[in-house]
From Swiss-Prot:
A Pfam family of this chain: Ribosomal_L18p
Organism for this UniProt entry: Borrelia turicatae (strain 91E135)
PANTHER family tied to this protein: 39S RIBOSOMAL PROTEIN L18, MITOCHONDRIAL (PTHR12899), LARGE RIBOSOMAL SUBUNIT PROTEIN UL18M (PTHR12899:SF3)
NCBIfam families per the UniProt record, alphabetical: L18_bact
Keywords: Ribonucleoprotein, Ribosomal protein, RNA-binding, rRNA-binding
Quaternary structure (record): Part of the 50S ribosomal subunit; part of the 5S rRNA/L5/L18/L25 subcomplex. Contacts the 5S and 23S rRNAs.
GO cellular component: cytosolic large ribosomal subunit
Superkingdom, natural source: Bacteria
Organism taxonomic ancestry: Bacteria, Pseudomonadati, Spirochaetota, Spirochaetia, Spirochaetales
Function: This is one of the proteins that bind and probably mediate the attachment of the 5S RNA into the large ribosomal subunit, where it forms part of the central protuberance.
Record-given protein name: Large ribosomal subunit protein uL18
A single GO molecular function term of this UniProt record: 5S rRNA binding
GO BP field: translation
rRNA-binding found in the keyword field: yes
Family the entry assigns: Belongs to the universal ribosomal protein uL18 family.
Length: 119
């Protein structure tokens, strides 16, 4: 149990260190944050100053019918890019939320860049 608590503390410390480094999202350049569960992948675009979520997508949405694999995560990035372009948001701050920039996280960020969003 002690090892689990220490791992949780390390994860929280890593998240805080990353958030301190990237700064806050504002209306003209909001923060996009990702969360991976064992089954699903969630993404939110957040304006930290106003405290509002501007857009969100996830693999749990029934109309998308996506799984948690690299190809579907790329599609998820394209869907989010379309939502952001409809709201005239072209620049984002990418918050990887403590995860390594590899695999699903990297493919999601790449799909946003390919869709024309400056990350």
């Amino acid at each position: 149990m002690k090892k689990v608590k220490e791992a949780e503390k390390r994860n929280i410390k890593r998240k805080k260190r990353i958030r301190d480094r990237i700064g806050f999202g504002v209306a003209d350049r909001p923060r996009v944050t990702v969360f991976k569960s064992n089954k699903y992948f969630y993404v939110q675009v957040i304006d930290d100053v106003a405290g509002h979520t501007l857009a969100s997508v996830s693999t749990i949405e029934k109309d998308l019918k996506l799984n948690k694999n690299i190809d579907d995560i790329r599609k998820l990035g394209e869907v989010l890019a379309k939502k952001l372009k409809d709201k005239n948001i072209n620049k984002l701050i990418f918050d990887r939320n403590g995860y390594k920039y590899h695999g699903l996280i990297a493919s999601f960020a790449t799909s946003l860049r390919e869709a024309g969003i400056d990350v």
